[in-house]
């Protein structure tokens, strides 16, 4: 993170935005070559590899996965061959597991997600507190802004675990509404992409 006064931002967020614009432009201009591994797909993968390599220097595996996944679906939308896409998916999933289990802290976070009660006071603490938050919400929630878990119990509740706080404050019904709105947002985005008159706007 880079601090500017009282604010801070992650450089990877800016890189992510620039990469999406670049890929949308490049695929719209040279999309007819996307099925050519050397002249079409290869150069785009090279740019992606450079970007995710820089992000991993931070290191930030979560953003790396998000960036790679976004570009993957852009390649799918641009008409890349299924054989190439399947190969990329296999290599990508294998690469993620290698990155997870070659760093002890990542492996601990992954295993803690599968069984947080194994280490409830350290690696499993955040997951357990998020479950408490969701369970406390019940059907209708405790009320907007009245969460107890966000008062120093659940770390990073405004980013990584915002959904748990939503569940506590709005309850099961409120969470269903939020999920429904997210699906509506996705559907509207897909509809806009499909009906967009130019390839750049559609991919973007």
What are these regions (language model features)?
Residues 1-126, 164-204:
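Hydrophobic alpha-helical transmembrane segments of multi-pass inner membrane proteins, especially
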Residues 124-145:
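Extracytosolic (periplasmic/ER-lumenal) interhelical loops and adjacent juxtamembrane/interface segments
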Residues 138-170, 193-196, 200:
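Long extracytoplasmic/lumenal interhelical loops at the membrane interface
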